[in-house]
UniProtKB/Swiss-Prot annotation:
GO biological process per UniProt: aerobic respiration; electron transport coupled proton transport
Compartment(s) of residence: Cell inner membrane
Top EC class of this enzyme: translocase
Organism: Erythrobacter litoralis (strain HTCC2594)
Family assignment from sequence similarity: Belongs to the complex I 20 kDa subunit family.
Name of this chain's protein: NADH-quinone oxidoreductase subunit B
């Protein structure tokens, strides 16, 4: 695992004293304080767009191998990713998040780039699994791209072989945090 993967694993919320640490607790506490003081919120249009964007991620699957099965699990009733504001779409023109899951071969790399270019701005990429992150088990094969970040810019790396549905869900929540704190409409 690389340093990015270790960082992703250690940024997870942990239990301290029987209480689960909320990753965005300070953000929501500040909003609650402002609403309690004034009874309303004053914000900029840009902040409103950022807030709306975090709750309406439309993602498309680019399932290339066995990690795609875990993407299916995340949409089933047990996890139901739509509760977190992420809904699947079939067309790249309708989606703003691409989840690349599985081994990316040299022949498939131009197709991945073409689909990425068809997405509307702002667009985000989640790299799911060891094969998409760095080639994985097939790293030394002549036909494997050693990480989809060589073809498209990646925002979130989800480690594992295959990563669990919980790990992908955590990656989506990390992407929502990243969008919320980016501070600009354009990426």
């Amino acid at each position: 695992m690389t340093a990015d993967h270790n960082r992703a694993l250690h940024d997870a919320p942990t239990a301290r004293g029987g209480e689960v640490r909320q990753p965005d607790g300070d953000y929501f506490n500040a909003l609650q304080t402002e609403v309690n003081d004034k009874g309303f919120l004053v914000t900029s249009t840009e902040d409103l767009f950022q807030w709306a964007r975090t709750g309406s991620l439309w993602w498309m699957t680019f399932g290339l191998a066995c990690c795609a099965v875990e993407m299916i699990h995340v949409n089933m009733p047990r996890y139901d990713m739509e509760r977190f504001g992420a809904a699947p779409r079939a067309s790249p023109r309708q989606s703003d998040v691409m989840i690349v899951a599985g081994t990316l071969c040299n022949k498939m790399a131009p197709a991945l780039r073409k689909v990425y270019d068809q997405m509307s701005d702002p667009k985000y990429v989640i790299s799911m699994g060891s094969c998409a992150n760095g080639g994985g088990y097939y790293h030394y094969s002549y036909s494997v791209v050693r990480g989809c970040d060589r073809i498209v810019p990646v925002d979130i790396y989800v480690p594992g072989c295959p990563p669990t549905a919980e790990a992908l869900l955590y990656g989506v929540m990390q992407l929502q945090r990243k969008i919320r704190r980016s501070g600009t409409i354009e990426r």
